[in-house]
């Protein structure tokens, strides 16, 4: 089962509510309001941890919620901010909105931080609403709900070299021979179901990371077999080593195998087919491979590919191939990086509000209006009057009347219903 794709739910902490407090002290006969503000809710933050290389942890835990802010207190005391919930993810994690498929973040660099769900603002205490005409208001704001969304995480292995080829071409054997990685090795398709990383040490401080990309089959770019999952891992490698079964032990021709995999890479992402590629002609310990080598080498070298005969069984021919791969890595020119950000924050666009009539009731919808509803103290007449006054200032009442609403019509905002009235509140 793949662990390079995960679907999780994240929610920022709700803001703490404000306080409804009155100052009562000796020698302060007209103390007035003294309620403090609530604290902001904690954020849900992704941090890139270079020590991770899978999304397996998200297989067992899928719901993440940051701490809410503390409520405001008397004497103008401000509630404490909720703790941020920090979630570690491996380098190469792509964060998408599960509903829209929009890419929110592409997390590659160690220590990179991204806020995926912001905490809600703390509600204001009653001292914030004092005016010359209302010197001691009796209401406060509730805390703003934290942002919540479902995310789709995709992991693209970050490696210098990717091994591609048909199942059973000998990639896992090659990787275990040139590094300390120990992939599962057996004679059947899809032996490797997740990428296996290894470090190749050439000495003198020269090393690189190599990844055994799970085996490909014809039609992989259309999702045949486990194609999309496999191809996703290839995209960030700098160099490809195409491992061929030179002996054709599965009854296939090595040159035909090369063309099939090359075409799958090109169909999935044309840039992959143009990536620097070396050909490892494997299983040279078998007579059929030695017989096929001249024909395959001539055909591929005419197309610009360097062919290296190797044997996973005897470990012959590895050094020249690895040296050539290292040289290509050094020649690789990284894309121009974007200006670094200490912390990236996803801020969804506010879409305003809309009005429509359904079942004889006028409905008002919109993130801004929903936030106002959630933070209003509905059990308090002063707070309700403030809510209606804000709707009027935002032009909602005028828009309702222009749409055909009349006095006495029912207006519904979220779960709250009221009658449209001509007289100002």
UniProtKB/Swiss-Prot annotation:
- GO BP terms in the entry: ribosome biogenesis
Keywords, comma-separated and alphabetical:
Cytoplasm, GTP-binding, Hydrolase, Magnesium, Metal-binding, Nucleotide-binding
Q: Which CDD domains match?
A: Obg (cd01898)
Q: NCBIfam families of this UniProt entry?
A: Obg_CgtA (TIGR02729), Obg_CgtA_exten (TIGR03595), PRK12296.1 (NF008954), PRK12297.1 (NF008955), PRK12299.1 (NF008956)
Source organism per UniProt: Symbiobacterium thermophilum (strain DSM 24528 / JCM 14929 / IAM 14863 / T)
Recorded hits in InterPro entries, A to Z, give: G_OBG, GTP-bd, GTP-bd_Obg/CgtA, GTP-bd_prot_GTP1/OBG_C_sf, GTP1-OBG_CS, GTP1_OBG_dom, GTP1_OBG_dom_sf, OBG_GTPase
List the Gene3D superfamilies: GTP-binding protein OBG, C-terminal domain, GTP1/OBG domain, P-loop containing nucleotide triphosphate hydrolases
Cellular localization per UniProt:
Cytoplasm
Xref: PROSITE patterns? G_OBG (PS51710), GTP1_OBG (PS00905), OBG (PS51883), OCT (PS51881)
Q: Which family does it belong to?
A: Belongs to the TRAFAC class OBG-HflX-like GTPase superfamily. OBG GTPase family.
Q: What is this protein called?
A: GTPase Obg
* Enzyme Commission numbers on file: 3.6.5.-
Q: Name one GO cellular component term.
A: cytoplasm
Query: Which stretches make up the OCT domain?
Result: 345-422
What cofactor does this one take?
Answer: Mg(2+)
The record places domain Obg at 1-158
- GTP-binding among keywords: yes
Q: Where does GTP bind?
A: 165-172, 190-194, 212-215, 282-285, 311-313
Q: What class of enzyme is it?
A: hydrolase
Which terms in the Gene Ontology molecular function aspect does this entry carry?
A: GTP binding; GTPase activity; magnesium ion binding
How does it associate, per the subunit comment? Monomer.
Function, please?
A: An essential GTPase which binds GTP, GDP and possibly (p)ppGpp with moderate affinity, with high nucleotide exchange rates and a fairly low GTP hydrolysis rate. Plays a role in control of the cell cycle, stress response, ribosome biogenesis and in those bacteria that undergo differentiation, in morphogenesis control.
Asked if Cytoplasm is a keyword of the record, the answer is yes
Residues annotated for Mg(2+) binding in this entry: 172, 192
Annotated OBG-type G domain residues: 159-330
């Amino acid at each position: 089962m793949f662990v390079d794709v995960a679907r999780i739910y994240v929610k920022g902490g709700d803001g703490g509510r404000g306080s409804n407090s009155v100052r009562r002290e000796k020698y302060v006969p007209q103390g007035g309001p003294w309620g403090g503000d609530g604290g902001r809710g904690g954020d849900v933050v992704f941090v890139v941890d270079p020590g991770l290389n899978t999304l397996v942890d998200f297989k067992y835990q899928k719901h993440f919620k940051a701490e809410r802010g503390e409520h405001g207190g008397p004497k103008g005391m401000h509630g404490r901010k909720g703790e941020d919930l920090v979630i570690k993810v491996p380098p190469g994690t792509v964060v998408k909105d599960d509903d829209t498929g929009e890419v929110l973040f592409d997390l590659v660099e160690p220590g990179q931080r991204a806020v995926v769900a912001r905490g809600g603002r703390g509600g204001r205490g009653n001292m914030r609403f004092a005016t010359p005409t209302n010197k001691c208001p009796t209401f406060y704001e509730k805390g703003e709900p934290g942002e919540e969304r479902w995310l789709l995480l995709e992991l693209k292995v970050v490696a210098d070299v990717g091994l591609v080829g048909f199942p059973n071409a000998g990639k896992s054997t090659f990787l275990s021979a040139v590094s300390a990685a120990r992939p599962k090795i057996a004679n059947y398709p899809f032996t490797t179901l997740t990428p296996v990383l290894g470090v190749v040490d050439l000495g003198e401080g020269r090393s690189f990371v190599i990844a055994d990309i799970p085996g490909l089959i014809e039609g992989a770019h259309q999702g045949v077999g486990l194609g999309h999952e496999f191809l996703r891992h290839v995209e960030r490698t700098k160099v490809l080593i195409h491992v061929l079964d030179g002996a054709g032990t599965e009854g296939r021709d090595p040159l035909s195998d090369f063309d099939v995999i090359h075409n799958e890479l090109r169909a999935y992402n044309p840039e992959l087919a143009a990536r620097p590629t070396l050909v490892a002609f494997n299983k040279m310990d078998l007579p059929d491979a030695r017989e096929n080598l001249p024909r395959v080498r001539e055909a591929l070298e005419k197309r610009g590919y360097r062919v290296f005969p190797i044997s996973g069984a005897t470990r012959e021919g590895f050094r020249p191939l690895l040296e050539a791969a290292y040289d290509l890595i050094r020649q690789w020119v990284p894309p121009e990086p974007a200006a670094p950000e200490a912390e990236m924050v996803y801020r969804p666009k506010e879409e305003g509000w809309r009005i429509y009539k359904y079942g004889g009731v006028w409905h008002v919808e919109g993130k801004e209006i929903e936030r106002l509803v959630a933070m209003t103290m509905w059990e308090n007449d002063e707070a309700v009057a403030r809510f209606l006054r804000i709707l009027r200032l935002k032009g909602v009442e005028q828009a309702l009347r222009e749409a055909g609403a009349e006095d006495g019509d029912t207006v519904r905002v979220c779960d709250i219903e009221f009658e449209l009235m001509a007289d100002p509140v």
